[in-house]
């Protein structure tokens, strides 16, 4: 018997790439002196597809076309067709301007971008995906942490420092990068009337951002300015850096609605239910004057000529977000359960119920993970200690009530086929 087991181990074939045996994979393909398994083949195909996609995103002048940019955005961001078109055209024109700046006497001005939309609708993801497509340095900054120079908080120059760090201190690359400033709606004026007291985190930050957004040579301290005052400064020209500002602008829809009401009154007036339109629908009618009333200063709005408004995500879009993208939430949790040798299944009704809960919470796609955690918390707590669990099924009852997801055991599966339906 010992000799037979020794022969079996000698005859066992292994993948030359990952080292798995023929018994651990579905298929092992033989080549001259090497073997490759089906899992490694799939991995190689994914790598080739990604490289082909990024290599294909180049037109004759080295800049992806708007259609190509929009096509890749579709792979990562669900919905928001109008915002994708606006972004694709603006980014294409920006990098085309950079590549042809020396070939004409006409100087093309930069068009920074403002993204306005409800929370959890994909503003940040759009900016991150753009940077990935174009292979340029990208950094995100939180506007709420910024203050005027000389006050407690971060200086505006720290944004350029983060971009330098993302480009590994290559100044030339950093000068063609993308900066995304989030929560820009939180740096609005505290009131419409100018005050005798300084607004160092609101209007003061807008004033400080004006120069770097328009284009200036910023003196950037490599280690941060306030802690190391004696260091040498790096000179970074911000003229060709693309700035994208994003914010939820809570309450802006009311300003837009008020502007559209007019002065009609009496029996002939058009009476509308204030809840009949969503926030995203109001944003479609946005005018620059609405942003001024919200608290942005005219000079700041003028530095952001391209405005893309995003819509609320409906039920179908949220269900697609749960299952569609490469790193979809459902796939993430299924992988977690796979590590416990348990199959996780969601019914179609459960998906719809999760999407409806996210809409009621008004948290957009960002709230989906919180809902999934609530549903699966007790199951994930009990499952590692439970023996024989083969499958967990999440149905509509588990989403809408305190009912736990169904746990199907291996020895009971033949006796209880109806419990999973």
UniProtKB/Swiss-Prot annotation:
One Pfam family per UniProt: zf-C4_ClpX
Entries under SUPFAM superfamilies matching the protein: Glucocorticoid receptor-like (DNA-binding domain), P-loop containing nucleoside triphosphate hydrolases
Gene Ontology MF: a single term: zinc ion binding
Record-listed Zn(2+) binding positions: 15, 18, 37, 40
UniProt keyword list: ATP-binding, Chaperone, Metal-binding, Nucleotide-binding, Zinc
Entry-linked InterPro entries: AAA+_ATPase, ATP-dep_Clp_protease_ClpX, ATPase_AAA_core, Clp_ATPase_C, Clp_protease_ATP-bd_su_ClpX, ClpX_bact, P-loop_NTPase, Znf_CppX_C4
Positions with a binding annotation for ATP: 118-125
Positions of the ClpX-type ZB domain: 3-56
Signal peptide region: none
SMART domains: AAA, ClpB_D2-small, zf-C4_ClpX
GO BP annotations listed: cell division; proteolysis involved in protein catabolic process
GO cellular component labels: HslUV protease complex
Family: Belongs to the ClpX chaperone family.
Subunit structure, as described in the record: Component of the ClpX-ClpP complex. Forms a hexameric ring that, in the presence of ATP, binds to fourteen ClpP subunits assembled into a disk-like structure with a central cavity, resembling the structure of eukaryotic proteasomes.
Entry function: ATP-dependent specificity component of the Clp protease. It directs the protease to specific substrates. Can perform chaperone functions in the absence of ClpP.
Protein name, per record: ATP-dependent Clp protease ATP-binding subunit ClpX
Lineage of the organism: Bacteria, Pseudomonadati, Pseudomonadota, Alphaproteobacteria, Rhodobacterales
């Amino acid at each position: 018997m010992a000799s037979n087991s020794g022969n079996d181990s000698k005859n066992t074939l292994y993948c030359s790439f990952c080292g798995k045996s023929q018994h651990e994979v579905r298929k092992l393909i033989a080549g001259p002196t090497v073997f490759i398994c089906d899992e490694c083949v799939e991995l190689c195909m994914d790598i080739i597809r990604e490289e082909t996609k990024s290599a294909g995103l180049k037109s004759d002048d080295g800049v992806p076309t708007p259609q190509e940019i929009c096509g890749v955005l579709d792979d990562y961001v669900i919905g928001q067709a109008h915002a994708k078109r606006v972004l694709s055209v603006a980014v294409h024109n920006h990098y085309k301007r950079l590549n042809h700046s020396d070939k004409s006497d006409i100087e093309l001005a930069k068009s920074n971008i403002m993204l306005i939309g409800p929370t959890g609708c994909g503003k940040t993801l759009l900016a991150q995906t753009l940077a990935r497509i174009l292979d340029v340095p990208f950094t995100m900054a939180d506007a709420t942490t910024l203050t005027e120079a000389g006050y407690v908080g971060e200086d505006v120059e720290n944004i350029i420092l983060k971009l330098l760090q993302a480009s590994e201190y290559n100044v030339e690359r950093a000068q063609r990068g993308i900066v995304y400033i989030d929560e820009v709606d939180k740096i609005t004026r505290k009131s419409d009337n100018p005050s005798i007291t300084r607004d160092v985190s609101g209007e003061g930050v807008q004033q400080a951002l004006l120069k770097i957004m328009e284009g200036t040579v910023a003196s950037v301290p490599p280690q941060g300015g306030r802690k190391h005052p004696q260091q040498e400064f790096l000179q970074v020209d911000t003229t060709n850096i693309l700035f994208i500002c994003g914010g939820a602008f809570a309450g802006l829809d009311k300003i837009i609605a008020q502007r559209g009401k007019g002065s009609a009154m009496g029996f002939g007036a058009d009476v509308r239910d204030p809840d009949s339109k969503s926030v995203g629908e109001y944003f479609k009618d946005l005018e620059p004057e609405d942003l001024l009333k919200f608290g942005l200063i005219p000079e700041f709005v003028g530095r952001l000529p391209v405005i893309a408004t995003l819509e609320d995500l409906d039920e179908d879009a949220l269900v697609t977000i749960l299952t569609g993208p490469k790193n979809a939430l459902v796939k993430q949790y299924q992988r977690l359960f796979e590590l416990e040798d348990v199959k996780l299944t969601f019914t179609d009704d459960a998906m719809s119920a999760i999407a409806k809960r996210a809409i009621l919470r008004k948290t957009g796609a960002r709230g989906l993970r919180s809902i999934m955690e609530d549903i699966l918390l007790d199951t994930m707590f009990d499952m590692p200690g439970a023996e024989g669990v083969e499958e967990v099924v999440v149905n509509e009852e588990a989403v809408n009530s305190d009912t736990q997801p169904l746990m199907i055991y291996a020895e009971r599966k033949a006796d209880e086929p109806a419990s999973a339906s």
